Amino acid sequence: MSELAAVLTRSMQASAGDLMVLDRETSLWCRHPWPEVHGLAESVCGWLLDHDRPAAVGLVGEPTVELVAAIQGAWLAGAAVSILPGPVRGANDQRWADATLTRFLGIGVRTVLSQGSYLARLRSVDTAGVTIGDLSTAAHTNRSATPVASEGPAVLQGTAGSTGAPRTAILSPGAVLSNLRGLNQRVGTDAATDVGCSWLPLYHDMGLAFVLSAALAGAPLWLAPTTAFTASPFRWLSWLSDSGATMTAAPNFAYNLIGKYARRVSEVDLGALRVTLNGGEPVDCDGLTRFAEAMAPFGFDAGAVLPSYGLAESTCAVTVPVPGIGLLADRVIDGSGAHKHAVLGNPIPGMEVRISCGDQAAGNASREIGEIEIRGASMMAGYLGQQPIDPDDWFATGDLGYLGAGGLVVCGRAKEVISIAGRNIFPTEVELVAAQVRGVREGAVVALGTGDRSTRPGLVVAAEFRGPDEANARAELIQRVASECGIVPSDVVFVSPGSLPRTSSGKLRRLAVRRSLEMAD
C-alpha cells in the first residue's frame, strides 16, 4: 500500500479518539472510534477488490462514517478517490444524477459508491460502463483484504472553476500526506488535547483536508453535513460548544454571517477554540474582526483566528499563520486611499512561495504586487488530460499578492483585475464595500470591468438584493464605492437572491456572471 494509506492505518488503529457524525434526520451524534472506522475501510477495500479492483472510485453522499471510511478503503485497494457533491435544493434529480455520472466518466471513474437517496437517484440513470455500489453494503461486509501496492494517484480533486472551466488536479499519495503533515505541524495538532469540528463538504479540498488531518493525528473529530449548517448556521456554534472543539475551519462568509447577526447567539462556550481556519475565499478583515469581537463574551480568543491561503492544486494548504497571533491586517495605500488585506501566514513545511513581478503585476505606492507562484511536496502531478508538471518548476496560481513581514498577502485574481484610466482595481475591495449596503446579500456581490471591447471602460457591480427600495440602495452603493474605492460604478445591477451562478463549493462564477450581463445587454 502507499505510504499515505500505511500511515493512516497506523494512526487510526492506534487512536483512542472518536469520529462523531451528526445524523441530520435525528439531530443525534453517533460515536465511531477511529479503529472502528478503519475496520469499515478494510471492508470497503475488500468490496472493491471483489469488483474488478478499480483504478479510481467515485464517492457521493452525506458525510457518514461509511463515506469517511471509503476514502481510506479506496487507498487500501490502491485506487484514487474522487468526491462529487449531491444535488442542490431545487435541482432535477434525473439531471443531477446524469451530470454526476457523466463527470465521473469524464475523469475515468467507472466505480461509484453512494448510499440512501443519492444511491437511488444514481441508479435511475441508464449509464453503461459504470458500476454503482451501495456504500452501506460495501462498508459492512466484514470482508478484509490484503492492501494493494499502487503508484497511482490518491485524489482526483476538482478545482473551483470560479474564473473559468473547472479542471481536475491529480494528487499523489505523497502530496496528500505532505500537506496533511505540514498542516498538522503548523497548527500543532495534538490527539491528546485537540478536538476538531467541521461542516465543510468533503468534495472540497479544505473539507477533505480537515477530516484527513484529524484522522492522521488520531484526534477526535465532530463531523456535520454541510446541509445542516446551511439550514441553521448558528448550530455551528452549538456544535463547537458541545464538542469542546479546539479546531474548526470555514470560508470567510461563515464568519461574516455569525459576526453580523451575533445578537442571536446565546449560551455557548467557545473558550476551547485555539484554531479557527479561514480559507477558500477572500478574507474580509473588518468582518473577521467583528466576528472575533462578537464572540469574545462567549470565551473566544481572537488569537485563534487563522486566515490562510490554499488551493486544490497544492492538495489544500499553502500558507497558514501560527496559532495565537490572530488576524494581522496590512494596510496598502494607493491613489484611492488605504486598503486592508489579511496577512495569510508563511508556507507550511514542504511548500515555498514567491512573487513574480511580470506583466500581470499591479503596482501601487506602498507594495510591489505580482503573481503568486508556489512549489513543494504538496503539489499536484498535473491536471488530468494535460502534461505533467515538473516538481521543481514554480506553479503560477493566477492570484496576485505580495510578501509582507508576517507572510503572504493576497490581493485578488490576475484575470479579474479591473483596469480603468490607468488604475488597477481589485474586485474584492469593491465587493466588500458594496456588501455593506442594507439589502445587499453579503458574499453575493461581483465587481466586473466592462472589458477592452467597451468604448468606455467602466466598473459594473452585480449584487443579489432583497429590499423595498432599489433606487436608494443603488445610490448608496455608488456613493460608498466612490468614497472608499475611488471609482464610480458605471452600472449597478440588482438580481434576486440566489440568482448569481456559483460553483459546487459556493464560489461565485465570475465569468458566468459576466456572460449573463453581456447577454442582457
Swiss-Prot record:
Gene3D superfamilies: 3.30.300.30, N-terminal domain of ligase-like. One of its GO terms (biological process) is fatty acid biosynthetic process. It is an enzyme of class 6 (ligase). GO terms for cellular component: plasma membrane. Pathway: Siderophore biosynthesis; mycobactin biosynthesis. GO terms for molecular function: adenylyltransferase activity; ATP binding; long-chain fatty acid [acyl-carrier-protein] ligase activity. It comes from the Bacteria. PROSITE patterns: AMP_BINDING. Keywords: ATP-binding, Ligase, Nucleotide-binding. Its EC number is 6.2.1.20, 6.2.1.47. The keyword ATP-binding applies. It catalyses: a long-chain fatty acid + holo-[ACP] + ATP = a long-chain fatty acyl-[ACP] + AMP + diphosphate; a medium-chain fatty acid + holo-[ACP] + ATP = a medium-chain fatty acyl-[ACP] + AMP + diphosphate. InterPro entries: AMP-bd_C_sf, AMP-binding_CS, AMP-dep_synth/lig_dom, ANL_N_sf. Activates lipidic moieties required for mycobactin biosynthesis. Converts medium- to long-chain aliphatic fatty acids into acyl adenylate, which is further transferred on to the phosphopantetheine arm of the carrier protein MbtL. NCBIfam families: PRK05851.1. Belongs to the ATP-dependent AMP-binding enzyme family. This is Medium/long-chain-fatty-acid--[acyl-carrier-protein] ligase MbtM. It comes from Mycobacterium tuberculosis (strain CDC 1551 / Oshkosh). The gene is mbtM.
